[in-house]
């Protein structure tokens, strides 16, 4: 014998079937961030160190700023050479132009390593 439905589960009269619900909670829009990647790199370099949300926000702004600068410079270089595609060569040159001395060398070597790893994994 099937169980009897309680008063709570019964449908209420007066509401049209299939009508859109207005009392649903709105989903918050996702905010993209480099936070998890910054955290992973920090743990590789300093495993016993933490980071505050304010410091993470500053680091995220820094990464966004550098990304925009490199992208703009690489775009400019492609335009100067009458190319419609930004390749790793333009990005590498942009990094050399934007970052000072030793920092540029390290960035280029890490970038080359990342591109090589990506192409071999395909």
From Swiss-Prot:
This is Histone H2B, gonadal. It is found in: Nucleus; Chromosome. Monoubiquitination of Lys-117 gives a specific tag for epigenetic transcriptional activation and is also prerequisite for histone H3 'Lys-4' and 'Lys-79' methylation. One of its GO terms (molecular function) is protein heterodimerization activity. InterPro entries: Histone-fold, Histone_H2A/H2B/H3, Histone_H2B, HISTONE_H2B_site. It comes from Asterias rubens (Common European starfish). Core component of nucleosome. Nucleosomes wrap and compact DNA into chromatin, limiting DNA accessibility to the cellular machineries which require DNA as a template. Histones thereby play a central role in transcription regulation, DNA repair, DNA replication and chromosomal stability. DNA accessibility is regulated via a complex set of post-translational modifications of histones, also called histone code, and nucleosome remodeling. The nucleosome is a histone octamer containing two molecules each of H2A, H2B, H3 and H4 assembled in one H3-H4 heterotetramer and two H2A-H2B heterodimers. The octamer wraps approximately 147 bp of DNA. Glycans are attached at residue 109. One of its GO terms (cellular component) is nucleosome. Residues 1-31 are annotated as: Disordered. Keywords: Chromosome, DNA-binding, Glycoprotein, Isopeptide bond, Methylation, Nucleosome core, Nucleus, Ubl conjugation. Pfam families: Histone. The modification N,N-dimethylproline is found at residue 2. There is a cross-link at residue 117 (Glycyl lysine isopeptide (Lys-Gly) (interchain with G-Cter in ubiquitin)). Gene3D superfamilies: Histone, subunit A (1.10.20.10). It comes from the Eukaryota. Belongs to the histone H2B family.
């Amino acid at each position: 014998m099937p169980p009897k439905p309680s008063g709570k589960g019964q449908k209420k009269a007066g509401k049209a079937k299939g009508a859109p619900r207005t009392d649903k909670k709105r989903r918050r829009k996702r905010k993209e961030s480099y936070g998890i990647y910054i955290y992973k790199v920090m743990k590789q370099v300093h495993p016993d160190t933490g980071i505050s949300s304010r410091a993470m926000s500053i680091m995220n702004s820094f990464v966004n700023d550098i990304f925009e600068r490199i992208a703009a410079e690489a775009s400019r270089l492609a335009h100067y050479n009458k190319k419609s595609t930004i390749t790793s060569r333009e990005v590498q040159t942009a990094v050399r132009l934007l970052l000072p001395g030793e920092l540029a060398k390290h960035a280029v070597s890490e970038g080359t390593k990342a591109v090589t790893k990506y192409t071999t994994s395909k």
